[in-house]
Amino acid sequence: MIVKTEEELQALKEIGYICAKVRNTMQAATKPGITTKELDNIAKELFEEYGAISAPIHDENFPGQTCISVNEEVAHGIPSKRVIREGDLVNIDVSALKNGYYADTGISFVVGESDDPMKQKVCDVATMAFENAIAKVKPGTKLSNIGKAVHNTARQNDLKVIKNLTGHGVGLSLHEAPAHVLNYFDPKDKTLLTEGMVLAIEPFISSNASFVTEGKNEWAFETSDKSFVAQIEHTVIVTKDGPILTTKIEEE
């Protein structure tokens, strides 16, 4: 969507705050011994408290309030009886709507200590890639600069990007124009960023694989070689005064 009024801006900030609060609370609770279903129940309670609705359920009929992906799962992991263990690489992806306005956010992190430093490396580089990407976000610049920044960050750290998972427009639905915010440079994409445009920007940084495939069920994505993959995602509003991250809150 394109934000045109103060009311729209405040509505997007409100749902962004809610999604950030849910994401942070779930991350803080992700300790060895908890199940992904128990983590998802935290989201259910908070959505109810704040008067928000899970977007995966509302828009996609997804079997969970949030997507929780562990180790070999890259995205769209279904909350289940799976028990979190020390050293797991976990991704929590939270999207929701309130009063018709949406936000989408995600974070990858290592639970406690891992004996494989690559797990932490993909998380750190995903954060760097996101920061380098939003530095390119201003009205009149090319959308493709985002993907170029993400891909360059990965390459500089001897890592890959996942090419068939992308960011997207967001705001009045979970997925809207632009349909894809790529994590690599596409010279054919001439789309320009405009004032008020709302994007979900989400680098996926991989230890080796460049593509995901369908995993153990109809929802989850995995890599064929069990690469470690990390994602960082925020909902971003393009403005001439710099990007507004609706899903980043002060306590971070």
From Swiss-Prot:
Belongs to the peptidase M24A family. Methionine aminopeptidase type 1 subfamily. HAMAP family: MetAP_1. NCBIfam families: met_pdase_I. The keyword Protease applies. Its EC number is 3.4.11.18. Its cofactor is Co(2+); Zn(2+); Mn(2+); Fe(2+). It comes from Staphylococcus aureus (strain Mu50 / ATCC 700699). Keywords: Aminopeptidase, Hydrolase, Metal-binding, Protease. GO terms for biological process: proteolysis. It is an enzyme of class 3 (hydrolase). A divalent metal cation 2 binds at D104, H168, E202, E233. Monomer. This is Methionine aminopeptidase. A divalent metal cation 1 binds at D93, D104, E233. It catalyses: Release of N-terminal amino acids, preferentially methionine, from peptides and arylamides. Pfam families: Peptidase_M24. The keyword Cytoplasm does not apply. The lineage of its organism: Bacteria, Bacillati, Bacillota, Bacilli, Bacillales. GO terms for molecular function: initiator methionyl aminopeptidase activity; metal ion binding; metalloaminopeptidase activity. Removes the N-terminal methionine from nascent proteins. The N-terminal methionine is often cleaved when the second residue in the primary sequence is small and uncharged (Met-Ala-, Cys, Gly, Pro, Ser, Thr, or Val). Requires deformylation of the N(alpha)-formylated initiator methionine before it can be hydrolyzed. Substrate binds at H76, H175. Binds 2 divalent metal cations per subunit. Has a high-affinity and a low affinity metal-binding site. The true nature of the physiological cofactor is under debate. The enzyme is active with cobalt, zinc, manganese or divalent iron ions. Most likely, methionine aminopeptidases function as mononuclear Fe(2+)-metalloproteases under physiological conditions, and the catalytically relevant metal-binding site has been assigned to the histidine-containing high-affinity site.
